[in-house]
Curated annotation (Swiss-Prot):
GO BP terms, alphabetized: glycogen metabolic process; intracellular monoatomic ion homeostasis; mitotic spindle assembly checkpoint signaling; regulation of protein localization to nucleus
Gene that this polypeptide is encoded by: YPI1
Compositionally biased intervals (Polar residues): 1-16
Sequence similarity: Belongs to the YPI1 family.
Keyword Nucleus: yes
Compositional bias segments (type: Basic residues): 96-107
Key word Signal present: no
GO cellular component: nucleus; protein phosphatase type 1 complex
Localization in the cell: Nucleus
The protein, known as: Type 1 phosphatases regulator YPI1
Keywords from the UniProt entry: Nucleus
Function: Regulator of type 1 phosphatases which maintains protein phosphatase activity under strict control.
Residues spanning the membrane: none
Species lineage: Eukaryota, Fungi, Dikarya, Ascomycota, Saccharomycotina
UniProt superkingdom: Eukaryota
Length: 126
C-alpha cells in the first residue's frame, strides 16, 4: 500500500495596511419645513375659560412678604400674651423662654390679606 503524500507548499499572502488621515465628519441638521398653515383651530363645542373666574393653574407656593427685622412667625395674633392656664412655662424649668413683646395691643400690625388663590370665590349673582 503505497500512499502518495504531497508536501504542502506554503502559500504566500501579504497584508497591506493603508493608513489614511481621518477627516472630521460634518453633520448638518435641518429643521422640518415650516407649515404655513400651522394655526390652532377650535371647534364650536370648545369652551372658552377666560373671564369665567376659573383658576387656570395649580399654585405650589404663595408669596408672603418677609416679616420686619425682629419679628418672628410665632408672634402672630393680637391679644395673645400666653399668660393663661394653657401656658407651658412651668414644663421645662431651665429652658430659655422667648420674650413676648405683644401684651394684647395691636401696634398697627395686621395679617396680610389673602391673595386671589387664598380667597374663596364670591357666588355670581344671576
Amino acid at each position: 500500500m503505497s500512499h502518495n503524500q504531497q508536501a504542502a507548499q506554503p502559500s504566500s499572502s501579504r497584508t497591506q495596511v493603508i493608513e489614511r488621515e481621518a477627516s472630521p465628519g460634518v453633520l448638518t441638521v435641518r429643521g422640518a419645513a415650516e407649515d404655513e398653515d400651522s394655526n390652532v383651530r377650535f371647534t364650536e363645542e370648545v369652551v372658552d375659560n377666560e373671564h369665567m373666574d376659573k383658576k387656570k393653574s395649580k399654585i405650589c407656593c404663595i408669596y408672603h412678604p418677609p416679616a420686619e427685622f425682629g419679628e418672628s412667625s410665632e408672634e402672630e395674633s393680637c391679644g395673645s400674651d400666653d399668660s393663661g392656664p394653657e401656658s407651658d412655662e412651668g414644663d421645662i424649668p431651665n429652658a430659655r423662654k422667648p420674650k413676648k413683646k405683644n401684651k394684647g395691643k395691636c401696634g398697627g400690625h395686621r395679617d396680610p390679606s389673602p391673595n386671589a388663590y387664598e380667597r374663596k370665590p364670591r357666588p355670581k349673582k344671576n
